[in-house]
């Protein structure tokens, strides 16, 4: 067991603020969050904003919003990588002092000429700096970069908790630049310095970074620092097995909020996307924290499956606390740039949730089924509802209205009164329910007639029946 595995767990999510929070990045953040939270560890957030041309405050805000919506809370302040550039440069100079790095005065033109000659001669284009072993007394007064003095023989071995043992032949790795000629650090150095200084014990990230692990291990070893535990997770592919792209649908996390998926459902689905705990498909965040481990992560890319996502989200909506559901619905409306609920609508919707939550897989679907509670009179009938409100049906509704004016307003009493009325008319209750649904909701497929009547109340029920009867 490595020393890192014996320490309190510290994980991190380190996105670049060049766009929205990608769903793949969100899953990486989630895996780090679950691993830390399940072990009473620390989950840190670092914004890797060293690329000043592409990094934007708007992208940083979008990342923070996406993580917040998913419920992935981080510990401490958000760390800016750019703000730590002086520390990175300090480490580069320390590597120089240790003999683990050297000043390279080769110009870009010289490097390109070296590569062109290598290509022409069929040799490796891996740049071998002539300054690696040069005596400092021969150094010119000219701009230089600092390169790491990578070993040229042997191999660098990565013991990865997902990918297994991965070996890199050192002769295939060049002396990477750690500090540019303008004094700014490279990404490869900054990542290692930040992870070390932040006390990161486990680096859980996409397997597109696996090759970086070899170079970064060399930096750790050059500085005499403990190497963290690596876990490189496979990427997410589209349903067709190809790399996820816009043609597969939404890529940004905020798009999923705007489409009305519940955060708990997204967490559940993303956790299951590439990780397994037996045959369990539905689980709470508490269960996921307790169960999540690196050994359960598969090596093959996971495929995005929107049908599974909807099914899982539907299960979460069904068991959601009413207050939490109302909060998320309001947030969904804001994210989708739709009008907020009025106090009357919110009150009715809250009262109707018990009859709706197990009938919807997304919030738009739930709100569609809640139209009866949200719309104002007169209720517009769709084609099927208009057909159900023929002359005979309108007459029946007129006769029913006085009975409802005196009925006790409870589900049991309403059921008894309407069943008795249908019996007197020589019809089954189903024949009566059709016109009632059409009058109350303007639809023929609705929640229970009794649930709708209880939610909107006696006065609104009678008013809607009178509107329909008079049409």
Swiss-Prot record:
Q: Which domain of life is it from?
A: Bacteria
Please provide one cellular component term from the Gene Ontology annotations of this protein. Answer: cytosol
Q: What broad class of enzyme is this? A: ligase
What stretch of residues is annotated with the motif 'KMSKS' region? Answer: 243-247
List keywords of the entry alphabetically. Aminoacyl-tRNA synthetase, ATP-binding, Cytoplasm, Ligase, Nucleotide-binding, Protein biosynthesis
Name the residues that bind ATP.
246
- A single GO BP annotation from the record? glutamyl-tRNA aminoacylation
Q: Where's it found, cell-wise?
A: Cytoplasm
Q: Which InterPro entries match?
A: aa-tRNA-synth_I_cd-bd, aa-tRNA-synth_I_codon-bd_sub2, aa-tRNA-synth_I_CS, aa_tRNA-synth_I_cd-bd_sf, Glu-tRNA-ligase_bac/mito, Glu/Gln-tRNA-synth, Glu/Gln-tRNA-synth_Ib_cat-dom, GluQ/Sye
Q: Which Pfam families match?
A: Anticodon_2, tRNA-synt_1c
Residue numbers of motif 'HIGH' region?
Answer: 15-25
- Would I find Cytoplasm among this entry's keywords? yes
Q: Which GO terms describe its molecular function?
A: ATP binding; glutamate-tRNA ligase activity; tRNA binding; zinc ion binding
Q: Which residues form the signal peptide?
A: none
Task: Please list the reactions this protein catalyses.
Answer: tRNA(Glu) + L-glutamate + ATP = L-glutamyl-tRNA(Glu) + AMP + diphosphate
The Enzyme Commission number assigned here is 6.1.1.17
How this chain assembles, per its entry, is: Monomer.
> What functional role does this protein have?
Catalyzes the attachment of glutamate to tRNA(Glu) in a two-step reaction: glutamate is first activated by ATP to form Glu-AMP and then transferred to the acceptor end of tRNA(Glu).
Q: Can you tell me which family this protein belongs to?
A: Belongs to the class-I aminoacyl-tRNA synthetase family. Glutamate--tRNA ligase type 1 subfamily.
Family annotation (HAMAP family): Glu_tRNA_synth_type1
What is the protein name for this chain? Glutamate--tRNA ligase 2
What gene does this protein come from? gltX2
């Amino acid at each position: 067991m490595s020393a890192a595995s014996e320490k309190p767990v510290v994980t991190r999510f380190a996105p670049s603020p060049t766009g929205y929070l990608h769903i793949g990045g969100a899953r990486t953040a989630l895996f780090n969050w679950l691993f830390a939270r399940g072990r009473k560890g620390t989950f840190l957030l670092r914004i890797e904003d060293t690329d000043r041309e592409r990094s934007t405050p708007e992208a940083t805000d979008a990342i923070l919003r996406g993580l917040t919506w998913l419920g992935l809370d981080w510990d401490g302040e958000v760390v800016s990588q750019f703000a730590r550039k002086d520390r990175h440069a300090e480490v580069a100079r320390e590597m120089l002092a240790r003999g683990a790095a050297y000043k390279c005065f080769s110009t870009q033109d010289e490097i390109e000429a070296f590569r062109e000659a290598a290509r022409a001669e069929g040799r490796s284009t891996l740049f071998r700096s002539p300054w690696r072993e040069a005596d400092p007394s021969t150094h010119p007064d000219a701009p230089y970069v600092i390169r790491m003095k990578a070993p040229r023989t042997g191999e660098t071995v990565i013991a990865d908790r997902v990918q297994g043992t991965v070996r890199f032949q050192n002769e295939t790795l060049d002396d990477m630049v750690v500090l540019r000629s303008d004094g700014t650090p490279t990404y490869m150095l900054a990542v290692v310095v930040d992870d070390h200084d932040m006390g990161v014990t486990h680096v859980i990230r996409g397997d597109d970074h696996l090759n970086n692990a070899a170079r970064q291990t060399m930096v750790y070893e050059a500085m005499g620092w403990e190497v963290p535990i690596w876990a490189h997770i496979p990427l997410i592919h589209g349903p067709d097995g190809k790399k996820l792209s816009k043609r597969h649908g939404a890529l940004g996390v905020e798009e999923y909020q705007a489409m009305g998926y519940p955060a708990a459902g997204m967490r559940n689905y993303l956790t299951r996307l590439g990780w397994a705990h037996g045959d369990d498909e539905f689980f709470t965040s508490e269960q996921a924290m307790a169960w999540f481990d690196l050994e359960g992560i598969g090596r093959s890319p996971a495929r995005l499956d929107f049908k599974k996502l909807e099914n899982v989200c539907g299960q979460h909506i069904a068991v959601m606390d009413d207050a939490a559901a109302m909060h998320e619905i309001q947030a969904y409306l804001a994210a989708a740039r739709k009008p907020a609920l009025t106090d009357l609508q919110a009150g009715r919707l809250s009262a109707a949730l018990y009859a709706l939550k197990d009938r919807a897989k997304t919030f738009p679907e739930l709100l569609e089924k809640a139209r009866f509670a949200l719309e104002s009179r007169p209720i517009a009938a769709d084609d099927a509802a208009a057909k159900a409100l023929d002359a005979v049906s309108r007459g029946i509704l007129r006769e029913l209205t006085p009975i409802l004016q005196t009925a006790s307003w409870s589900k049991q009493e309403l059921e008894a009164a309407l069943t008795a009325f249908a019996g007197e008319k020589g019809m089954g209750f189903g024949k009566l329910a059709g016109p009632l649904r059409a009058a109350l909701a303007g639809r023929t497929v609705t929640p229970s007639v009794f649930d709708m009547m209880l939610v909107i109340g006696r006065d609104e029920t009678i008013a809607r029946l009178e509107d329909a009867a008079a049409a």
